[in-house]
Structures are given as C-alpha cells and as structure tokens.
C-alpha cells in the first residue's frame, strides 16, 4: 500500500503528484514557491541522489579534514615583502615604516594572559569604564544575592549545539557514510500547551536520511510520556509500576497523506483509524489517506515539504506539530558518530513550578479537594507534602486526593 506508492526513490513518481516547474531542473529537487513558506513535495531519497550525482568526483563529499597548504620558506619571505609594499602604498609611508608596523602589530604579538592569571579577577588599576561597570555589578550581586538569568536559555541552547560538533566515533564502523543526508526537525509543544505553542520549538533534532521513523519517535521527549496514573494519597511511598510511555505505546507520524503508525509492539493500536473514518464518513474532501508501519520506513523513503507543518501524535491525543526546516549533506564539521543520532541540538528552557509552601523546590505532588491547601489544584515538593498531610507515623491527615506530578522543567 504505502510501500508501493511512496517507498521508491524513482523520480518518475513525482510526475503523478504534480507538474514540475520549468525551472526545477529535476523532479527530485525541492521547488520553492514565492507566496508560500514551504517547498513543494519532493522525494528525500531522490533529492539526495541527485545532489550526490552533481558533486561526485569533485571531492565535495569527503568527510576528511582539508589539508593545510604547505608554504615554502622562500614564498613566506616574498609574501611578507608584497604585504609591506601593499601597506606602504595604502598608508603612503615608506617600506621601512610598513615593515616596522608588521613587526609591532603582527599576529604573533597577540598574546594570551600570563601563566596563572585568573581571567575572572578584575584588576584594581584599570581605567576601562566597562570593567568598572562589571566590577560594580558583581559587587551588587554579592550584596543582594541575586541570580543572573540573562541569556541563560540561549547559552544552554548553543552549548547543546556545540557539544557534538566535529565528534568522531571511537568505532570506525559507526562512522557516517559520505553523502549521507541530515534533516533538521523542529518538534513544537503539544497543541494543548498554550504557552509558546505557536512560536517556540520544543526541541530541534538532527536525523539521518537512512534512519527509521521509529528512531525519531523514540528520541522525542515529552512530559506526557512520563505521567504516572493513579491516586496515591493513602500510599505515598508506593513506587509506581509504570509510566504512561510503558502503558500506551501507540503513536503515529503524518507526512503527505500517509499515517505512519508505530506497530512494533503487540499492544500498539492504529491511532489513525479514527481520523481516517471521520474523513471518509461524509466525504470531507481530504482525499484518501494511506497507512503504513513506522518501523518499515526511513526518511529517505518519504515525500516531504520543507517548512510545512506535519503531525506527531502519541498518548492517544498528545499532538505535536513537526516541521522539517532543512535538509543537507553531512559535512566534516558535523557529528560523524552515527550512534549519537537522532541528535538533540536545541531545547527550550522552561521555568519549573515551585512548591506552594517553601517556594524553593520543584513540585512533585499535586492535590485536589485538599482541606490544607489554599487553592485547588495545589502543588507541593515531596518534603512539604509529607509534613503537611501526614503525621510522624505516616498516617493520612484530613481528606484530599494526591497525584504524582512531573514538571516540564525537569527536561532543562
């Protein structure tokens, strides 16, 4: 079904889907439309093969570091003379003055700090205004015990992005092949999560074209997968047996008219069946949807549009918009360890929900119909929850309902 209509990399399949624009240059190449924010649909595998055919034989696919050109000693002297002549001509000075400028202001004169000097210590005898402002700011922080959170999120984001940059695998068998495609995927917040849902990607993940859809599905981290079902006011010490991800394993991706369902486990259900039946019930004009197994398809097998919103659904009704923002060939500066992909490079930073009592620690419990709480629902850390709701013997005080709470900020 889906294998026959979407799995093949042949460029001829595209002709059945759309009329190629005169400037396309090839049916596997993504075509940008000026009035739209996304490309037209194209086959990922065919696009990658077309790209590799254009570059093959030119050395552009190599993942080896380009060697630094060796400069003979005689050429260095000649280059210095030419540089002196150019500087003398631009500045209107003599060759001797240009040579002196090169000796005094050359790159070899740029030095780091002296051995043992601490870059965090501001010297006393400085007349720089910026250092004076910095010193007063640091003194103010010590006096008021304030926490500087300026740019904390962006610093963390760039730290994640650079963590695996240029990393090589220890096992040569895990090396990414030359010409491999890398796709950038933005995972947005669940639709029911109102804050940031329209403009803040929840996660940005890099996936390889040869990886299966199930690998991306397992890499997406959502707080709804970690929820613990049940009411624990009478047994707060009881360890939960399962989290939602262990109980409800069904999920699907939706790309270009096809639902790719996760069917790896016997308990997995076809979550797309309800949507397909609703679409076909009154001829709603959506066309005929297809279904396929997520574990049977790689990203190279897909038809996609760059910049177009697709869907990832799990836990029955937790829906994430998925946007593929970029597709490119792997470069020698990328992470070349296949085992690290799908690679998380950006993650939105969230404020954690604090305990209502101490205002310090992250909430671990949420209560309803609580006679000890000023609001409903009310959030508590583990220590405050037990001190307020149980006696020294661990017996329950009063009437309330208690549920384990997983804070989204724990993913920071």
UniProtKB/Swiss-Prot annotation:
Described purpose of this protein according to its UniProt entry: Part of the SNAPc complex required for the transcription of both RNA polymerase II and III small-nuclear RNA genes. Binds to the proximal sequence element (PSE), a non-TATA-box basal promoter element common to these 2 types of genes. Recruits TBP and BRF2 to the U6 snRNA TATA box.
Protein name from the UniProt record: snRNA-activating protein complex subunit 3
Taxonomic classification: Eukaryota, Metazoa, Chordata, Craniata, Vertebrata
Family: Belongs to the SNAPC3/SRD2 family.
Gene that encodes the chain: SNAPC3
GO molecular function (one): RNA polymerase III type 3 promoter sequence-specific DNA binding
A GO BP annotation: snRNA transcription by RNA polymerase III
Oligomer status and interactors: Part of the SNAPc complex composed of 5 subunits: SNAPC1, SNAPC2, SNAPC3, SNAPC4 and SNAPC5. SNAPC3 interacts with SNAPC1.
Gene Ontology CC: nucleus; snRNA-activating protein complex
Chain intervals with Gly residues compositional bias: 1-10
